Amino acid sequence: MRPADTWKDYELLDATDGNRLERWGETLLVRPDPQVVWKTPQQSSLWAKADAVYHRSNQGGGEWEYRRRLPEKWKITCGEGEDKLTLIVSPTGFKHTGVFPEQAVNWAWYAKKIRAAGRPIKVLNLFGYTGGATLACAAAGATVCHVDASKGIVAWGKDNAAASGLADRAIRWLVDDCAKFVAREKRRGNTYDGIIMDPPSYGRGPGGEIWKLEDCIYDLISQCEEVLSDKPLFFAVNSYTTGLSPAVMEYMLKTTLIPRFGGKTSCDEIGLPVSATGGVVPCGATAIWEE
């Protein structure tokens, strides 16, 4: 497992009985996590000091219980030096905060790969969410095309770019259905040296298009292969779906990309270290093809 263990403004303090206790800057949040199936005793005294707790509803969704007044949003930083990003945190109605902290281990990998390339790199970030990967790539010098189906989420990404001092970088922010966008890019003859995709398990595009990961992921990977440049640098696929193992994702990349480009593939879980126990909570998986 590859842990995201370089954070200073984020910390997974403890995890048990279906919940995480997290520190986001100076704010303590409790959020549900279906991966946390163990019911060990709470190891941190800070559970009782949580500033807000998210409660799931039996009807789906849920709501926040605020135990003290919190700002609507606040900022945290990730990375150091030229890789430092400033990201806006805001608790949403679906338990999320605008940042998936485990992805920081991938952001650092993308940035390192781009800096070492020694040539101009164009990156396509599909299902780009609030832009952590986009900004990591842009800070490393890449030209980035960021695509997400949610107008509000793309606006959040632009705000993160401004907060990180990257608003003037070569980033295209697009609200679009990812599969339809890739098909249009193929017709236009546009290509990319790096592709990142972080698809949801289930979702709908801006035109009501239905996305189900297991049904759609192979076709999308195959489409994306056709918009890679003649000398691509990397292709990364992230998944939070327990039914889609890292090895399955790697197999799709291996059989789709290696016959044309050579290179190598790898896969692993990513996770967050738990301060109270020294363990690591799994938070999804990443499969990578690289030159």
Please identify what each model-predicted range represents.
Residues 8-22, 29-101, 108:
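Non-catalytic substrate-recognition/targeting regions of SAM-dependent transferases
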Residues 101-119:
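Conserved alpha-helix/loop element of class I SAM-dependent methyltransferases that forms part
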Residues 118-129:
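Conserved class I S-adenosyl-L-methionine
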Residues 128, 148-152, 216:
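Short beta->alpha hinge that forms the Motif I/post-I loop of the SAM-binding pocket
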Residues 130-144:
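Conserved SAM-binding loop of SAM-dependent methyltransferases across substrates and taxa
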Residues 150-196:
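S-adenosyl-L-methionine
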Residues 215-230:
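A short glycine-rich, Lys/Arg-flanked "PGG" loop and its adjoining helix->strand segment in the class I
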Residues 232-291:
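C-terminal catalytic and target-recognition region of SAM-dependent MTase-like enzymes
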